């Protein structure tokens, strides 16, 4: 297939909408023209994920086809390519290139595809038998000692015993403690991935055929070097649920082979990366509750004398039949994260480490934000982004996520509880701890007491900036000591032992008192292990940068916050061929340009804001110009505004929207919604409105109300859901069809300007403007723009919950006269802007609403 056909069809499994074609063409053009950044807004429900898959996979296969075609052409014409090769290349490499080894490469690729097809038609149990047979054909090398070890220890005691809580002996300041250092043999070095020109790509492909890359003589797998894909598509999203949705979408299209008829059935090599919490199959590790504890328990077990029966950090394990079988099963069809665990169990192979070994072969890799955005995590997982395509979905939260990854916070209460936990642990086990463990625990406890005293003595106001050197003034603690303590925490795995011991004590005490810990409390404790929080905070203390700042936050906390998210993001930009930032609500895009991409030339950035797939008549957005409806900080508590104008609007809207359809209203904060509810209840207005529509409202510590609201809507009784911007229901919930026929935004949800975080951010932004030669007026405008961007991003994210598919319909009501101002309207998503109705009074809005729904044939009850 030629390039024209590639770029026009994209192998979309259905007839694509115009905006899907527009998005696919934009992505393909960005990749073909070598642009660095694409910022794409495509509303939820418009098939964004599938469009991204089709465009990027089409380009990837086309790119590989181009390389293959040029290789064929060079070989057929016996073209001398030596001038494009390095002068120090040995003669045999050039001779090999000039001879027709290409056919051998093709044969190996074809053999591997046939091998994957055989696996795809075989059950997991049958595959294990097939692996035993395959070693006779030279594909795998049997490693009998590993098999015997795995078969010999199937029954495990997974209860928590006291021995589980005791660390191995630790020698203070000794380098011999670090059992985590190991070499990973049989891997290609980073330089082998740096393929910037066609000829370097050709050389690498040839190298992988005939041995320029060093091969392990114990490696019986003839496929692992042949099938590496240096150029990959990395797709990152916020949750594993979203990554699972990507997997289901990837199964829909079919893409042609990069090698046409020579390798006719080239499968998509898809690899879902996940954490040990999702993929671990060892009961001794799985019994721990938190990701941090699981990671430490895994490392502790792997480095113990007993070891893990599912994994060994050796080339022998990597090339044993079952490890290779699991790798190939991953690629035999498109597997979800949940599929990897039963596959690993059936073969007795760790799916977490086996999936990491499969990384070089993969074409498409999905991974959670943390894996992509943390440079240290990418390094530890050997994720090389060189010349690859990086797609970051749900990117509206990208800046906040980067800031969160590189920030840390610890409260006075956290420090006191951690101190108490260490004392409890130390008193219990001190006689069973070696001197190295005892000394370091005492040092750690002393450090905690120093931080406690610093907060008690120095906390004056939220947003007060802190010089980190002041925290330890007058103590014998310095940065070197903190480095040593961090190393102790990492090597000894003491954090999870102390945290889990104290949690076990709480559960035991609760059980004895016949007063079980509430499930919600247990979850909160296990999800925030205190000593892990402390170690993260200490890490920030030892890795100071000019882009971060320590300051006091509420609840007597010290927070370290990254102020320049563009700095850690630079490493991704520098390595990747292209970075695609995609989301349903990406406006205002100026936030990305100023905060994340300040050094990227505008010519290298492409932006696209798509309209919705629904017909224009399926959506109306109303803004009233009634001056009474202005929810500024000074006016929003007004009894007249709350009890008269706001209340009457909801009564009128509740009557205008058919009862079969639900109404979802978003309020700027829990505090304000609680104030409104209280006012309405004091004068029976709440009961009056509740008689028109059953009211469900979100409370900060309340129970889940979504199921009750959904049931009420399904029964057609008329339902009103009052939710919070940034709350549990404003993101990730699909209010499609009758769940939301009207979405109301009450006021403009500006963030709290008195929070320590915003005080420091605004001060930093103003200082940066002034330092670059700006005026005070320019600094003031920049901080105002910063606050507006936060506000409007929240608005777009909330109202985007309403329309979820092509046949859906709903109305949006922006209930504040300030939405009429150009600076706010221009920051609405394009599809919302294009649907704005010019009605002015609430009476006109309600009248137009009745007409809208009368045309939709909704049954009114």
UniProtKB/Swiss-Prot annotation:
[4Fe-4S] cluster binds at residues 280, 298, 308, 350. GO terms for cellular component: nucleus. It catalyses: Couples ATP hydrolysis with the unwinding of duplex DNA at the replication fork by translocating in the 5'-3' direction. This creates two antiparallel DNA single strands (ssDNA). The leading ssDNA polymer is the template for DNA polymerase III holoenzyme which synthesizes a continuous strand; ATP + H2O = ADP + phosphate + H(+). A motif (DEAH box) lies at residues 393-396. It is found in: Nucleus. Binds 1 [4Fe-4S] cluster. GO terms for biological process: DNA damage response; establishment of sister chromatid cohesion; nucleobase-containing compound metabolic process. Residues 161-188 are annotated as: Disordered. ATP-dependent DNA helicase important for chromosome transmission and normal cell cycle progression in G(2)/M. May have a role in changing DNA topology to allow the loading of proteins involved in maintaining sister chromatid cohesion in the vicinity of the centromeres. Has a specific role in chromosome segregation during meiosis II. This is ATP-dependent DNA helicase CHL1. The lineage of its organism: Eukaryota, Fungi, Dikarya, Ascomycota, Saccharomycotina. The gene is CHL1.
């Amino acid at each position: 297939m030629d390039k024209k056909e590639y770029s026009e069809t994209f192998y979309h499994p259905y007839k694509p909408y115009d905006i899907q074609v527009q998005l696919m063409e934009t992505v393909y053009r960005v990749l073909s023209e070598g642009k660095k950044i694409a910022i794409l807004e495509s509303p939820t429900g418009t098939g964004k994920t599938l469009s991204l898959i089709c465009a990027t996979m089409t380009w990837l296969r086309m790119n590989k086809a181009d390389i293959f075609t040029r290789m064929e052409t060079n070989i057929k014409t016996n073209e001398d390519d030596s001038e494009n090769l390095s002068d120090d290349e040995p003669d045999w490499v050039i001779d090999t290139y000039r001879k027709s080894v290409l056919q051998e490469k093709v044969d190996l690729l074809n053999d591997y595809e046939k091998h994957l097809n055989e696996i795809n038609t075989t059950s997991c149990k049958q595959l294990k038998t097939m692996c035993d047979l395959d070693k006779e054909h030279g594909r795998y090398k049997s490693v009998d000692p590993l098999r015997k070890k795995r078969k010999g220890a199937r029954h495990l005691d997974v209860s928590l015993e006291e021995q589980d809580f005791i660390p191995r002996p630790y020698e203070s300041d000794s380098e011999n403690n670090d059992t985590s250092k190991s070499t990973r043999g049989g891997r290609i070095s980073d330089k082998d991935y740096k393929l910037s020109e066609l000829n370097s790509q050709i050389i690498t492909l040839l190298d992988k055929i005939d041995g320029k890359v060093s091969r392990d003589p114990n490696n019986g797998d003839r496929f692992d070097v042949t099938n590496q894909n240096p150029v990959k598509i990395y797709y990152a999203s916020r949750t594993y649920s979203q990554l699972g949705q990507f997997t289901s979408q990837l199964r829909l299209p079919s893409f042609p082979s990069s090698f046409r008829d020579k390798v006719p059935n080239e499968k998509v090599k898809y690899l879902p990366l996940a954490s040990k919490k999702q993929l671990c199959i060892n009961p001794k590790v799985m019994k721990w509750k938190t990701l941090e504890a699981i990671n430490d328990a895994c490392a502790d077990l792997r480095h113990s004398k007993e070891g893990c029966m599912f994994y060994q950090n050796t080339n022998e394990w990597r090339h044993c039949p079952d490890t290779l079988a699991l790798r190939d099963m991953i690629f035999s069809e498109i597997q979800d994260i949940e599929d990897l665990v039963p596959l690993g169990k059936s073969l007795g192979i760790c799916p977490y480490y086996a999936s990491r070994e499969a990384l070089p072969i993969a074409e498409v890799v999905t991974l959670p934000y943390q894996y992509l955005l943390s440079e240290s995590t990418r390094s530890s997982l050997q994720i090389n982004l060189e010349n690859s395509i990086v797609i970051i979905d749900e990117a509206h939260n990208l800046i906040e996520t980067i800031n969160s990854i590189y920030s840390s916070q610890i409260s006075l209460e956290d420090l006191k509880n951690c101190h108490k936990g260490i004392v409890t642990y130390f008193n219990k086990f001190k006689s069973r701890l070696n001197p190295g463990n005892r000394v370091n625990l005492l040092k750690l406890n002393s450090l905690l007491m120093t931080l406690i005293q610093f907060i008690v003595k120095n906390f004056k106001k939220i947003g007060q900036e802190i010089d980190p050197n002041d925290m330890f003034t007058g103590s014998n603690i310095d940065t070197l000591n903190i480095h040593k303590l961090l190393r102790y925490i990492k090597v000894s795995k003491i954090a999870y032992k102390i945290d889990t011991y104290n949690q076990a004590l709480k559960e035991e005490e609760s059980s004895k008192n016949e007063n079980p810990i509430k499930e919600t409390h247990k979850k909160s404790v296990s999800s925030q292990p205190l000593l892990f929080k402390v170690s993260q905070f200490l890490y920030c203390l030892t890795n100071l940068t000019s882009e971060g700042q320590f300051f006091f936050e509420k609840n007597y906390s010290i927070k370290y916050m990254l102020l320049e998210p563009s700095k850690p993001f630079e490493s991704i930009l520098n390595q990747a061929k292209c970075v695609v930032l995609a989301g349903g609500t990406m406006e205002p895009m100026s936030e990305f340009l100023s905060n994340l991409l300040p050094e990227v030339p505008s010519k290298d950035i492409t932006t696209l804001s798509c309209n919705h797939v629904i017909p224009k008549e399926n959506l109306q957005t109303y803004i009233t110009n009634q001056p009474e409806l202005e929810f500024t900080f000074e006016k929003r508590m007004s009894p007249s505004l709350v009890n008269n104008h706001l209340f009457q609007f909801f009564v009128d809207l509740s009557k205008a929207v058919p009862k079969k359809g639900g109404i979802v209203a978003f309020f700027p904060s829990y505090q304000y919604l609680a104030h409104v509810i209280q006012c309405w209840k004091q004068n029976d207005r709440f009961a009056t409105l509740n008689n028109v529509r059953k009211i469900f409202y979100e409370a900060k510590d309340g129970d889940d109300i979504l199921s009750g609201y959904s049931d009420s809507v399904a029964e057609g009784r008329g339902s009103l859901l009052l939710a919070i911007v940034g709350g549990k229901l404003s993101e990730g919930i699909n209010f499609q069809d009758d769940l939301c026929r009207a979405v109301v935004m009450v006021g403009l949800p500006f963030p709290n300007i008195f929070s320590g975080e915003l005080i420091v951010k605004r001060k930093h932004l103003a200082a940066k403007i002034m330092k670059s030669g700006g005026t005070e007026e320019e600094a003031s405008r920049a901080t105002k723009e910063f606050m507006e961007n936060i506000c409007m991003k929240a608005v777009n994210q909330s109202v985007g919950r309403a329309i979820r598919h092509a046949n859906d319909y709903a109305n949006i009501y922006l209930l504040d006269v300030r939405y009429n101002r150009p600076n706010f309207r221009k920051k609405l998503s394009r599809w919302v802007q294009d649907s704005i109705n010019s009605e002015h009074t609430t009476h006109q809005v309600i009248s137009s609403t009745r007409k809208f729904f009368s045309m939709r044939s909704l049954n009114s009850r």
